[in-house]
Amino acid sequence: MARGTGQFEVAVGVIGKLRVEGYEAYLAGGCVRDLLLGREPKDYDVATSATPDVVLGLFERTFAVGAHFGVVLVATCGGADTPCGAGGNSGEQEYFITEVATFRSDGAYSDGRHPDAVRYTKSAEEDVKRRDFTINGLLMDPLRNIEEQPQVPFGRLRAGSRLPSVAQDDKHPFAAQDEGIGRDNLRSSVLDFVGGMADLEAGVVRAIGRAELRFEEDHLRMLRGVRFAARFGFAIEDGTKTAMRGLASRLAAVSRERVRDELTKMLTEGRARRAFELLDVTGLLTEVLPEVARMKGVEQPAQYHPEGDVWVHTLGLLGQLEEGCSATLAWGALLHDVGKPPTFRRAPDRIRFDGHVDVGVAMGAEILRRFRFSNEETRQILALIENHMRFADAGRMKTSTLKRFFRLPEFEEHLALHRMDCLAGSGNLEHWEFVRERFEAMPAETVRPRPLITGRELIAAGYAPGAGFKEMLRAVEDAQLEGIIATPEEALRMVRERFPIDGGGGQVNE
């Protein structure tokens, strides 16, 4: 889906068309928040007094994805006024999706996620007051300063208008520059029924109305509140935080997939450390990841971990995760030492965690199963846990062993995890530098060369198929990786010398 100014224009066009037909319509929710923060929104949502049936009839290409909740998707191609399919093959056109939701009030939430019933309303204020947080409860009228221009179709932006530049840091919530439609026009176009503007300026995440009621309606809102606070560098308002602590146990009723997705966003938005600190102080961490919560207070040997306990060390890794990092690397960083708490032992010489890698792999597998990760993601995250201690042995590895180490899928993630692990501990990057230099210097074709021989050649050479083939081929590959042999002829000669055939029909002499 296309992003940016074009999508903004399309959303404004949708609003303009609804206005022409006599309905209220505004930009709503996260896109308003992000515009005011000087960030480029990922999506533009519209809230309107028009019912879903009206929206479906007004626009040529629509999808009633949430009709029960008053949600319709409007598809537009090539520009704010071009329906999909106009002027050619719609499959080759740039297209935009705008989510249009009817003003509504919600009934009871018996499942802790969806309202049992909704009632459409003509009141924008009533619609806003059912939402989660004040910073997400703002509406914006993008036509306020341009709707007097009749030459602009459906209220499209006048030529030359543009979004405020996206802030490159979080120095201040209103970091947008006064250009194009600008900060002042943005602020003057906002409808605020819940005090969201003041909370944006103060940097506060506050539930709309009674926090307990908002969290009873949708328990996942507690995790979303933590994520917003971490992402924007905001504080959680005291009453909202108290409600989170009191209702944390309600998260047990939320589907594991929804919890997983929210945690993954926390881990990959560039504020993972702050997010998990907030999960801890709100009591939510114990509910969603008790294995991670148990890292707190687990001492480590000071000579290797001067930073402190396992929890502090793990936070040190999370603090290094960059925005947009892969989910597998992020979860690998979070869980790499999950096996330490149950293996803690105070030995005569120092604190030890014997077998913590194997225990961690088993615990990680259970956590990932619980959160219903895909098989592919599970394999990669468990591989990161399983191999994170191997770097210390790399200098003593045979060349063949080192090359097989490099064959691990997404080996760059193993390098990244080990580097973070070192920097969150002693700071010694000696092993990381050794492995990185050799990995970068080693041509891919030498790490995974074509096999010199296969089972077919062994049969042709007189060997009977059997379990011994695996050992023979492994020995050949070892020699090839070590650079001892390089041709099929050398491979067969080595096999005949190391695995001679007896006189009884191709069996190998042991």
PLM region spans:
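Catalytic cores of the polymerase beta-like nucleotidyltransferase superfamily
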Residues: 1-160, 164, 169-510
